[in-house]
Amino acid sequence: MSQTPLSPPPVGGRVVVAMSGGVDSSVTAALLKEQGHDVVGLTMRLYDHGKPLGPGARTCCAGQDIHDARRVADRLGIAHYVLDYESRFREDVIEPFAASYGRGETPIPCVLCNQTVKFRDLLAAALDLGGTALATGHYVRRLDGPEGPRLYRAVDPGRDQSYFLFATTKGQLGRLLFPLGAMASKDETRAIARRLGLAVGDKPDSQDICFVPDGDYAKVVERLRPGVVEAGEIVDLDGTVLGHHPGLIHFTVGQRRGVGIGGSAEPLYVIALDTATHRLVVGPHAALARREIAVSGLNWLGEGEGPASAGTRARIKIRHASPPFPGQIFPGAAAGEARVVLDEPAHGVAPGQAAVFYGLDDNDARVLGGGWIGASR
């Protein structure tokens, strides 16, 4: 089915840019300014780490990043505002992150952040400022289809962030711009930053979870959920105790390295995290095989209101870095649920991660939606 890039807002119209202080959002603002738009920058203050973060910190929306965003805005000659979203970020992202670990899941806080404080709250703020659209530095594409805007993977597969935006609604897509989705590579983005004299042109990409700058997420979870990081037994599929672990939070389904069990005739993988007994269940790779996946929190971006009752063919990603698996998506037993049946078993299906659906046309580039992974078999 044909699709074309959506027409940009009228030249001179106001576009609000979510500026994190990194090169991607900075170039986004610069490109829109070059195109003649009335650009306004918004930066979210999400988390107070108790001390300013230096230039080497690889997070986003922290002290140094806010400073960098303001410098870029000054360079571009655009208005720039900082919004204090710390309380709502804690409520909508950090607390659910900790609760998810307490349930033995492997959460993705970036999806929650996009779903709530960015595309709900920040978009509302952009509209309040008279903006016609909110632009971000995400590497995804928004194209026009017969029924309205669609979400597509970025041109550069190595930079594609569509997995993290599966929860973006159809209504939100109509108000969002992603100018970097058509970039051939990150090098092209950095080259634009240097051409425009932006100080962040060589700034490293953010790597850490923004509210865990030192990488010690267990400490954050323990502070929010005292007692959740509890040591326990490592057992095989028959319940035989093989060793002990420092806390389930340190493990995810499918993990092999760092389990701490040696001397086995074959490699052992994390099969399940039993939060009731604090047991870490390990087994052979074959025990990870799953074909059916229960999905909750379904967001549907394909045609109609959801997957077809007879099943919708798609390719399904169960982790950001995993290849998509062919299969079918069926409606679930309740609203907001779906059932995924893969053609062949996948390994490492972890509760708390997302199952994101891609269409079979256009080189699997169109995002049909997604949801949160629950039980699998």
Curated annotation (Swiss-Prot):
The keyword ATP-binding applies. It catalyses: S-sulfanyl-L-cysteinyl-[protein] + uridine(34) in tRNA + AH2 + ATP = 2-thiouridine(34) in tRNA + L-cysteinyl-[protein] + A + AMP + diphosphate + H(+). Keywords: ATP-binding, Cytoplasm, Disulfide bond, Nucleotide-binding, RNA-binding, Transferase, tRNA processing, tRNA-binding. It is found in: Cytoplasm. The keyword Transferase applies. Disulfide bonds join C113-C210. Its EC number is 2.8.1.13. The active site is at C113, C210. One of its GO terms (biological process) is tRNA wobble position uridine thiolation. Signal peptide: none annotated. Catalyzes the 2-thiolation of uridine at the wobble position (U34) of tRNA, leading to the formation of s(2)U34. Belongs to the MnmA/TRMU family. HAMAP family: tRNA_thiouridyl_MnmA (MF_00144). This is tRNA-specific 2-thiouridylase MnmA. It comes from Rhodospirillum rubrum (strain ATCC 11170 / ATH 1.1.1 / DSM 467 / LMG 4362 / NCIMB 8255 / S1). The gene is mnmA.
